Amino acid sequence: MRIGTGYFNSRCSITVRLLTWQDEAIDVRFIRRRIESAFALRQAMLPPRTTGYRLINGEGDFLPGLVFDVYGDFLVCQFMAAAANILKSLVIEMRVALLSPQGIYEKSEGSVRHEEGLLNTAGVVWGQEPPSLITIEENGCRFFIQVQSGQKTGFFLDQRNNRALVGSLSRGKRLLNGFSYSGGFGIVAAKQGAQRVVSVDSSAAALHLARQNWQGNDLPDTVGEHIQADMFSYLRETTEVFDVIVLDPPPFIRRRQDVRAGVKGYKEINLQALRLLPPGGLLFSFSCSQHLPMRDFLQTTLFAAADARRRVQILQHLEPGADHPINLAHGEGSYLKGVWLRVGD
């Protein structure tokens, strides 16, 4: 009995990457339809003056293992499955025809490639080399992007809507941006009138980029402070009180066997953050660990609130924006999860 059409890879735990349930050829016309559909979705959903966004989100756009991000006039691509890798030259050609970028940079790296039997690959695949800093616009702010050396493809595009939400609630507030990377949450908050923004990250390079972004948005130095520190230690040692805290850590759970240790980490940072919030204070807490489902993440924050002896309300569950669609049949694509919490009076 025929089920569908996809690519088979005997070397990987995911042996089949299904492309269609229909009896149709996987040819140029098929791939073009999928790419054009993804592009049309972004054109319809993206806020105006947004020049950094995800154009193709793998399984979420029914193109397994394929990621394309737009940063101004440049594209960054990832071919994270053998099925996507087979289509590389065809997909790049179509991207050029559709968007006319100045250059396309491939950044196909990580353990997923290894499992698929592929080597890590990084470098220009079409056109010009991206400059060391690319400027994009988002939420009325400018951000410098480091494609070659930055985290992920250069920026955490999946947090755009959540940055806008935090910014809208930050006027006159004292905000702590934990695991700040290039400062996104804090910069949007400062643009919206935050009274004070403290950005904490363990990476000197990330904080240097955050300072560049701060200056690039003409924000006053008297409002912002950038601190290089381990976030766990900072939360335990600081005596400063904040009105809004954002926790957007790297994944504490990269493998299933890391779940127990990772849950302890999430509980600890949320517990310590809740200690620093006054009644009415807001906590935006995120996890990008694929192996931690939302129900377990919420339970972890519940235990943190109990140990901190704080009464806490859930105001909203948080997810990526519409440029990161999730295939209903691919729950693993729902990696980023967050919760907006309020400390009770």
Regions found by a protein language model. Give the residues of each.
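Non-catalytic accessory regions of SAM-dependent methyltransferases
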Residues: M1-G72
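Non-catalytic substrate-recognition/targeting regions of SAM-dependent transferases
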Residues: I56-D69, N85-F156
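Conserved class I S-adenosyl-L-methionine
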Residues: G172-Y181
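Conserved SAM-binding loop of SAM-dependent methyltransferases across substrates and taxa
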Residues: S182-Q195
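Conserved SAM-binding motif I beta-strand of class I
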Residues: R196-D201
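S-adenosyl-L-methionine
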Residues: A205-V246
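Mobile active-site "lid"/loop adjacent to the S-adenosyl-L-methionine
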Residues: F242-Q272
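C-terminal catalytic and target-recognition region of SAM-dependent MTase-like enzymes
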Residues: L282-D345
